[in-house]
Amino acid sequence: MVKVGLVDDYRVDLEKLEAIVSRMQDVEIVFSTDSAKEAYRRVKNGDIDLLLADIEMPHMSGYELADLIKSHSLDVDVIFVTGHGGYAVHAFDLNVHDYIMKPYYADRLAASFDRYLKKKTETSLNGRILIKQKSEMHVLQKKDIIFAERTGRSTTIVTTAEEVQTYQTLNDIKGDLPEKDFLRSHRSFIINIHYIKHFSAYTKHSFTVSFEGTSKKAMITKQQLDYFQNYYF
């Protein structure tokens, strides 16, 4: 089921969009609003997978909204549905899924959703990571990794189900993990932001990190904690 948000300051266009999307299979409209600021609040809460947005809106444009989504590494795709063609080149700089011009037909929107669903399926197949050891290999679900710690020449990966040791470095592992979910919190740690429970001061420039799912703790520098607060909230 794809969870969708709709935002357009023009009520007639918003109602048309609602009518078309509500008839699609495996799609749930989570919210429909005329405010880009309200849409951004819902996006930050992790309420949706896909946002359909007009561009020219008061207070915050759809372009500004998509830019915030990208710059904060939020896991939401965007389809622009707009009457203005002049933003197309800049829109794709933001890696939006599609750019649909008004007036449009339902078939055009349905085709865009079909491409999105295909992309989503392909992406889900890439949700695993291969961790190498000297004599064996482990296949882990990325979403199950809580954190990884480098100690000496060994890296320990703590998951919701087990701990795995590997000779692979944090740099090797970080390259295979999505930036929107994993943060290099310290020279010795990579953490999954979705399992964070709280931070405790450790030194003037560092904090310990506690997680859901394990009693083990990681470290985060003050600089990276500031980054976490600014870019993930």
From Swiss-Prot:
Phosphorylated by NatK. One of its GO terms (cellular component) is protein-DNA complex. GO terms for biological process: regulation of DNA-templated transcription. Keywords: Cytoplasm, DNA-binding, Phosphoprotein, Transcription, Transcription regulation, Two-component regulatory system. Pfam families: LytTR, Response_reg. It is found in: Cytoplasm. The modification 4-aspartylphosphate is found at residue 54. SMART domains: LytTR (SM00850), REC (SM00448). Residues 129-233 form the HTH LytTR-type domain. GO terms for molecular function: phosphorelay response regulator activity; transcription cis-regulatory region binding. Gene3D superfamilies: 3.40.50.2300, LytTr DNA-binding domain (2.40.50.1020). Residues 3-117 form the Response regulatory domain. The keyword Phosphoprotein applies. Its main location: cytoplasm. It comes from the Bacteria. Member of the two-component regulatory system NatK/NatR that positively regulates the expression of the natAB operon. Acts by binding directly to the promoter of natAB. This is Transcriptional regulatory protein NatR.
